[in-house]
């Protein structure tokens, strides 16, 4: 396998997807208050054999306020990544997993997540801000 980049995504798939709106009253309440919902992202990885890594990218769209009535939306998206043999430095590996892989998979992940939100009765939802994973990484590093 020849890699022109420092990594290759061997597979990507939805590991878990969830939409929860308990009842019609909650749905009506959420429909009026969906603008308060926030998108949160978490990225975890675990090593597999043969320089492969499983990267789990989780998106949650949720209300941070303490309302009793709320909907909950979550997706866990997995990428199986083969890292080039030359990558030895932990920092380089972090950049690959937290920035490069994310930038590559995000269009599919975002589309799948938006489909979930739209099909859950919220067709007006748009994720206005594109996530800049490189910028996020730089902020966390400082």
Which residues does each PLM region occupy?
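N-terminal intrinsically disordered, cationic/polar leader segments
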Residues: 1-142
């Amino acid at each position: 396998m020849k890699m022109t980049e420092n990594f290759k995504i061997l597979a990507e798939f939805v590991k878990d997807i969830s939409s929860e709106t308990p009842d019609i009253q909650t749905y009506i309440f959420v429909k009026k208050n969906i603008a308060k919902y926030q998108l949160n992202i978490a990225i975890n990885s675990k090593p597999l054999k043969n320089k492969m890594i499983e990267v789990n990218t989780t998106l949650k769209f949720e209300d941070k306020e303490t309302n009793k009535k709320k909907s909950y939306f979550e997706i866990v998206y997995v990428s199986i990544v083969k890292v080039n043999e030359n990558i030895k430095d932990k920092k380089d590996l972090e950049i690959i997993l937290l920035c490069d892989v994310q930038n590559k998979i995000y269009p599919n992940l975002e589309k799948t997540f938006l489909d979930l939100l739209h099909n859950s009765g919220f067709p007006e939802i748009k994720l206005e801000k594109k996530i800049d994973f490189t910028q996020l990484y730089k902020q966390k590093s400082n």
